[in-house]
């Protein structure tokens, strides 16, 4: 199991290094995916602040969602974070998939955030 975690950490570091080079001052849309929930934050790395955040545990979403671990939950979280980011004055971000494959829940969240008005 530790080998899997080590490989994930290496992938995550490689993705973040590439993002830092390509960011050009844009905030980072960072995704964390657990087995039961999905979380996303818009982070300004220059100041070290979180500008907007959403997760499948938000009270607004919890009542509507059957579970936080499917694509439907990721779609709702993506829409919600886009709405909150736009309210905070952020429209252009760089997508940090945190070493996860761009497939399934991560892809659904990214597509919903794009539909919500975020550009990346």
Swiss-Prot record:
Keywords attached to this entry: Ribonucleoprotein, Ribosomal protein, RNA-binding, rRNA-binding
Chain segments annotated as coiled-coil in the UniProt record: none
Keyword Ribosomal protein annotated: yes
InterPro entries hit by this protein: Ribosomal_uL18_bac-type, Ribosomal_uL18_bac/euk
Highest rank taxon of the organism: Bacteria
Pfam family, one: Ribosomal_L18p
SUPFAM superfamilies per the UniProt record, alphabetical: Translational machinery components
Subunit comment: Part of the 50S ribosomal subunit; part of the 5S rRNA/L5/L18/L25 subcomplex. Contacts the 5S and 23S rRNAs.
Function (record text): This is one of the proteins that bind and probably mediate the attachment of the 5S RNA into the large ribosomal subunit, where it forms part of the central protuberance.
Sequence similarity: Belongs to the universal ribosomal protein uL18 family.
Protein name, UniProt field: Large ribosomal subunit protein uL18
């Amino acid at each position: 199991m530790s080998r899997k975690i080590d490989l994930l950490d290496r992938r995550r570091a490689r993705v973040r290094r590439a993002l830092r080079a390509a960011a050009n001052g844009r905030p980072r849309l960072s995704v964390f995916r657990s087995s039961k929930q999905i979380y996303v934050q818009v982070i300004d790395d220059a100041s070290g602040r979180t500008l907007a955040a959403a997760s499948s545990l938000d009270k607004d979403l919890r009542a509507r969602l059957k579970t936080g671990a499917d694509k439907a939950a990721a779609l709702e979280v993506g829409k919600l974070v886009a709405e909150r980011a736009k309210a905070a004055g952020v429209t252009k971000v760089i997508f940090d998939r945190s070493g996860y494959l761009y497939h399934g829940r991560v892809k659904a969240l990214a597509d919903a955030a794009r539909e919500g008005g975020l550009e990346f």
